[in-house]
């Protein structure tokens, strides 16, 4: 079974981009970006380093101060969910109110 971790970045005020880091059953990893691009890596650590280098932060590692710095309340946001890939990608770019 695959394991998903969600990451986000704020490229400009009022906008969030999500990325999904998935650990595959074969111990490889893949990142699904908000553009719909999927990038495969040999392992989870390489995928994490890729996201960190692109200024993403792990959603499960955010605290209220981190969230405020990105422009949202931690309790008001959850990773995107959708029944299929194209619908998920459409939800991976969010405008904040």
Report residues per predicted region:
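Short aromatic-glycine-(Arg/Gly/Cys) micro-motifs in beta-strand/loop hairpins
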Residues: 11-36, 54-59, 64
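Intrinsic-disorder/low-complexity coil detector
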Residues: 10-12, 78-79
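Mixed-charge, Lys/Arg-enriched low-complexity segments
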Residues: 44-97
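Residue-level signature for short turns and capping positions that connect secondary-structure elements
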Residues: 36-37, 46
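Negatively charged, low-complexity tracts enriched in Asp/Glu with abundant Ser/Thr
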Residues: 1-10, 97
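N-terminal functional modules and adjacent low-complexity/disordered segments of proteins
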Residues: 3, 11-12, 16, 67, ...
